[in-house]
Amino acid sequence: MPVHHRRISIGFQGGHSLALRVIEEQLEELYRALDGGGWHELETEDGPVRLYLGQVVYIRAENDDQRVGFSV
């Protein structure tokens, strides 16, 4: 069964953002790690990314149902 990656955007103080694709378990670990602050390693589709959570302002996770074209 193929692994499904979810698109997320992580916003940082100063206005920069980082777009990544992660599996659901990694997203849940990131949410839990936010309370602790400090550094967190996130395994993404393209490889590991280390984030300093003290600078994170927001995390936006897109829904799984992506639509292309015209739909009703």
Regions found by a protein language model. Name each.
Residues M1-V72:
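Eukaryotic intrinsically disordered, low-complexity regulatory linkers and tails enriched in Ser/Thr/Pro
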